[in-house]
Design a protein with these regions (language model features):
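Short strand-edge motifs at loop-to-beta-strand transitions and within beta-strands
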Residues: 405-407
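Short, surface-exposed beta-strand/loop patches at domain edges
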Residues: 428-487
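Noncatalytic modules at the cell exterior or secretory-pathway interfaces
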Residues: 415-427
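C-terminal motif of bacterial Sec signal peptides marking the signal peptidase cleavage site
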Residues: 9-10
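Buried hydrophobic-core signal for structured, non-transmembrane domains
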Residues: 360-364, 409, 425
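Extracellular/periplasmic, surface-exposed regions of secreted and cell-surface proteins
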Residues: 13-14
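Sec-dependent N-terminal signal peptides
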Residues: 1-4
Length: 487
């Protein structure tokens, strides 16, 4: 993953990776200097409270009617989400020594990526399909995900989980396999998502207990490994075809994605080539067809060097009418990180309302564990917003997130905005031990993403007093979304 490492100290901007256009202008130099001299004070919180628009009441009846119609549809999804989070975060129940999601009807059919480098799309969508089983059965389109126009890579060039997250969280998908069949080399325009993914958690590296609880809660965990095998090939010194068992002990970077769907603490060490030091393995669902392994499944030793380092789980999946509009400028998602060499920073994205709406929720990435956040919303933002961003008003949501990942946070009260009105979503982030706590998209020079800086207006600040435009200064967009309903 490409990373922007920006440190603003005194009057200069220092970067580990230099990006064009990152020179600070005279105003931002002065601001940075004042922050340094003035200490870490925060005068912005004394600003006026957000005002309620007169038109808010007029839209209440329509909103209540819509919410009533959605209530029954959402009821199952909300209960499922609450139960998942309870299992994942709160359960102290002892874990079984063995679990196989196949036996619970919680694994989607094994698919075949064939000769294309699309394992990342298959593993992502398999994990997503598993997350809704057995109550809902879906077959999502890997073709549509891997043909995302914001990514430059072809299907033969591979991908990674951040690309899957960007596709799903920007509401480009998922669409169904029927709408966009796999392997024809084309993807229809104008397809609408059949689900909205609102939360994706990234679990700690090699945390077996958390991974297992996530499998129990959500049906599967997307992860990565290194393999010398190609699609359908079983020739590898690290794979035992008789036992469908694999273990790679070296430090080579991962090149293949799978879905963890179970485990067996007593899976024998002797089943691996070469023999593992200890018993125990994860059960994984592959995308090489049913001829591979045990009907498309295989065991990977707990001692594998890579499996369990990167762990993605889809914890909140909602109906496509959960919100009317999504405001965003980060179609390529979390490409890098931005900050001031400290664990805290402020960020803001400014949007122009298309209709008379109410802002209901805000979405953002927590770049590491135990991220604390405070969310504000500023109305009637002027064309030059740097001074206005100091007057944030009241906190509309705050909390602490135990896992890294993407979160949609409902506001404690909906904020009305008028058609054509500029409004700012403002967030304060504090991520322990991080020095760049703000997730951004930018051109990392790796040929993966097609970045559009014209669709965003983002700002960052160290203390919330002096703000700089990230499109102008760092050539990036802030990953900070807003969800609205039409009044």
């Amino acid at each position: 993953m490409g990373i922007i490492l920006v440190m603003l100290c005194g009057c200069t901007a220092q970067q580990k990776e230099w990006l064009p256009g990152n020179e600070m202008n005279e105003e931002s130099e002065k601001e940075a200097e004042i922050e340094d001299l003035g200490g870490k004070t925060d005068k912005g919180r004394s600003g006026g409270l957000l005002e309620q628009a007169e038109g808010e009441k007029a839209g209440v009846d329509n909103l209540q009617k819509k919410e009533k119609n959605l209530r029954m549809k959402k009821q199952w999804g909300e209960k499922l989400y609450q139960e998942r989070i309870r299992q994942l975060l709160e359960s102290a129940d002892p874990l079984p020594k063995r679990y196989d999601a196949r036996e619970e009807g919680r694994t989607a059919p094994v698919e075949d990526q064939r000769e294309l480098g699309t394992c990342w799309a298959f593993s992502s969508l398999t994990a997503l399909e598993n997350a809704m089983l057995p109550q809902e059965i879906w077959d999502f389109s890997e073709d549509h995900m891997s043909h995302n126009p914001y990514f430059i890579l072809g299907q033969e060039n591979g991908g990674e989980y951040t690309m899957s997250m960007a596709y799903l969280l920007s509401w480009r998908g998922p669409v169904t396999e029927v709408q966009d069949p796999y392997g024809d080399g084309v993807s229809p325009e104008g397809l609408k998502p059949v689900k909205h993914v609102q939360e994706v958690r990234i679990l700690p590296e090699k945390d077996q207990e958390t991974i297992k609880r996530a499998v129990l809660a959500c049906g599967g965990v997307q992860s990565s490994l290194y393999t010398t095998m190609q699609n359908g090939d079983t020739q590898s010194e690290y794979y035992n075809p008789q036992t469908s068992a694999y273990c790679y002990p070296n430090s080579t970077a991962p090149n293949h994605d799978v879905v963890i769907v179970g485990w067996d603490d007593d899976f024998p060490a002797e089943a691996f080539w070469p023999k593992a030091k200890n018993n125990g393995a994860f059960l994984c669902e592959n995308s090489w067809g049913t001829e591979f392994g045990d009907g498309g499944f295989f065991y990977v030793s707990y001692e594998d060097a890579n499996l369990g380092k990167t762990n993605i789980v889809y914890t909140c999946i909602e109906e496509p009418d959960n919100y009317d509009s999504l405001y965003q400028s980060d179609h390529c998602g979390w490409v890098g990180q931005l900050g001031y060499g400290e664990e805290m920073a402020w960020a803001a994205n400014i949007y122009t309302a298309k209709y008379a709406e109410v802002v209901k929720a805000v979405g953002f990435y927590a770049v590491d564990e135990n991220t604390e956040y405070q969310i504000y919303l500023l109305r009637h933002v002027p064309e030059n917003p740097k001074k206005a961003l100091k007057q944030r008003g009241e906190i509309l949501a705050e909390g602490k997130l135990c896992h890294a990942g993407y979160y949609t946070i409902p506001l404690e009260k909906s904020i009305p905005v008028e058609a054509g009105e500029r409004f700012a979503v403002v967030i304060h982030l504090m991520t322990p031990e991080a020095i760049h706590p703000i997730a951004v998209e930018y051109d990392a020079g790796d040929g993966k993403c097609q970045i559009d800086l014209k669709d965003g207006e983002g700002y960052i600040s160290f203390e919330g007093e002096y703000w700089e435009n990230v499109e102008e200064q760092q050539s990036c967009n802030i990953c900070l979304k807003a969800y609205t309903d039409i009044r």
